[in-house]
């Protein structure tokens, strides 16, 4: 049985709609989250479909672990390097930022050269295949990641797009469609951005939630909050890639932007669905 959106039930009758919402929200299977979207407390239910998908992820990850263990070390390192380059090119491409594989390869060949554009982004992605741990616990941690990834690049492009608050932006920001229509307004004011990011980070670090789920939830919440003027997508994708590379096979983290780009319509539709007020935080 398909999990019907509350927004679909809304048009079938107010009584049925409210009853279904209350049943879901108060269900023993409901995980209620300490954060609200459009004034509704967020929650989710682990449906059979979601459980099956999570199981399939783990099965595929075991197969990937086995395959990579059988590849000679040098060949595997070369393949990881190729995947790293592809991920950086694609995460930029999604945002309309031009970068070439040649540029990224040159940075990888000389990581000490701090003068090249994209150096911060490349160096940060190298963490996916290293033992170094990155703290993602506080607003300051998120800001540090942004600084390492994108500060130099955005400063070079337009200093007005750099964050002007304690951690994030002070003013409003709109998310535009390809037709320049406003499809989402980032959270305001600065105090609310800081509060919601703290709540989102608490969810990300909640050990009672399955790791892949909390990574996905945080990815959505980051996009909803939209804490920066520029660089939100690339910062969010890096965080998700890094966390996936630590929870699953390293190569999984290098496939996120490809998966998003290949399913971009479905990806944006997912954001729109959760943003919809009639879905009441489901």
Model features per residue range: what roles?
Residues 1-282:
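FIC/Doc superfamily catalytic core
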């Amino acid at each position: 049985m398909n999990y019907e959106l509350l927004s679909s039930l809304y048009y079938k009758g107010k009584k049925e709609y409210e009853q279904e919402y209350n049943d879901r929200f108060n269900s023993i299977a409901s995980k209620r989250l300490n954060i609200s979207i459009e004034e509704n407390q967020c929650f989710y239910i682990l449906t059979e479909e979601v459980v099956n998908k999570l199981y399939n992820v783990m099965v595929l990850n075991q197969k990937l672990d086995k395959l990579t263990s059988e590849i000679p070390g040098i060949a595997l390192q070369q393949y990881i390097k190729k995947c790293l380059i592809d991920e950086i090119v694609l995460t930029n491409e999604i945002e309309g930022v031009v970068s070439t594989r040649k540029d990224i390869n040159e940075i990888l060949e000389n990581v000490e050269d701090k003068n090249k554009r994209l150096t911060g982004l490349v160096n940060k992605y190298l963490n996916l295949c290293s033992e170094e741990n990155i703290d993602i616990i506080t607003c300051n941690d998120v800001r540090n990641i942004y600084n390492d990834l994108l500060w130099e690049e955005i400063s070079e492009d337009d200093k007005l797009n750099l964050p002007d608050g304690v951690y994030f932006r002070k003013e409003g920001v709109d998310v535009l469609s390809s037709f320049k229509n406003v499809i989402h307004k980032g959270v305001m004011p600065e105090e609310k951005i800081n509060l919601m990011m703290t709540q989102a980070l608490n969810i990300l670090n909640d050990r009672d939630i399955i790791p892949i789920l909390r990574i996905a939830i945080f990815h959505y919440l980051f996009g909803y909050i939209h804490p920066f003027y520029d660089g939100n997508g690339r910062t969010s994708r890096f965080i998700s890639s890094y966390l996936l590379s630590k929870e699953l096979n390293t190569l999984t983290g290098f496939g996120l932007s490809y998966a998003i780009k290949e399913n971009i319509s479905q990806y944006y539709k997912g954001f729109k669905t959760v943003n919809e007020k009639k879905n009441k935080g489901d």
